[in-house]
Amino acid sequence: MNNLNGLSFHRLIVPFSKVSDMIDFQCDVFPDLDAATDEQLKQYSAVVYQREIDTNGKSLEIIKKYHSLGIKVIFDIDDIWTLPKSHYLSRLYEIHNIPAQTVEILKNVDLVITTTKHLASKIKKYNKNVEVIPNCLDHEDEQWKSNKTKSDKIRFGYIAGIFHKEDISILEMPIRKVLRHDINAQFVLGGYNDNADYNYYEKVMSGGTLTDKYQRVYSLPVHDYGKSYNETDVSLIPLQSNSFTECKSEIKLLEAGLHGNPAIVSDVLPYNILPKETAIFLNNSDINGWYKAIRNLSKDESMRKEYAESLQKYIEKHYNINKWTKVRKQILKSVLA
């Protein structure tokens, strides 16, 4: 693992740290697994890769090497491997032939772990040995313990990484409509960095003019970014619907739920696998629906509380990381047997 990002943090570092806390497992992180000698590798029963093994066409060779040493190869993947042309990595995927390489990996590893049943159905075409372990957040981690700052406005937050221009564009017209009316709402952008993408996000969230109806929250490290939710009261979760996004995980609803935020969310996969009472689900093209949801939640405290409690209870029951750590343990034991 050469760098720590949100993906590796949620899919490798946190869950395998939990597994490593169990007496019958030891999990180590290698900054550069390719540099490990055979003798170093032989002390391990399995290696776990996330999303890719090698981008230069050597993945199958690497897998065969592990197998020759008696080491099982586990592959964790949380996104579909074919990207739409609009995706910022599509050209890079094309140059390195990542889709074909990923299929080759899926066919040859001992176990695939993924995030949703929908994505698992795509993977099973190439490897029947696939298990679904959803993204979970560590409830004991300080960044997921709600500690809201005070505000005289109801704060509607969009907290996301870069490359979500198509998603946030869903909010542009509803926000402009809200700002034309006397509604006690403020729009909060979390994760801000001074670049073209976030400046576009800011234009959407502010309605094009920086006033006290808008707040900027700067980017935080991956182990702290959840604290951005303390500057929000309601989560806005827009997502375009296509073959790529429908294979993503529902993690934004998990983040909202643990921070006690009600959510207004696109009625698309992966979010609409949750019950309808957990959030306000809307069609992306329903400008008036998004406007009304923002207006109504800004005025109705009991409505905010009802949606927040419903989401939080569902998340705590179905996405409890300690529960899923036990499941992960049994899956690992099975593949290593």
Predicted features along the sequence, with ranges:
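N-terminal pre-catalytic "stem/leader" segment of glycosyltransferase-like enzymes
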Residues: 1-54
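Conserved acidic donor-binding segment of nucleotide-sugar-dependent glycosyltransferases
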Residues: 276-287, 296-302
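A charged, aromatic-enriched C-terminal amphipathic alpha-helix characteristic of glycosyltransferases
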Residues: 285, 302-333
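Carbohydrate-associated surface elements
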Residues: 118, 136
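Membrane-proximal helix-turn-helix segments that form the acceptor-binding/catalytic region
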Residues: 64-68, 92-111
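Nucleotide-sugar-dependent
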Residues: 54, 166, 221-228, 233-255, ...
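Conserved catalytic-core segment of nucleotide-activated headgroup transferases in glycan assembly
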Residues: 3-18, 138-144, 149-230
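A short beta-strand/loop micro-motif in the catalytic core of glycosyltransferases
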Residues: 48, 74, 108-116
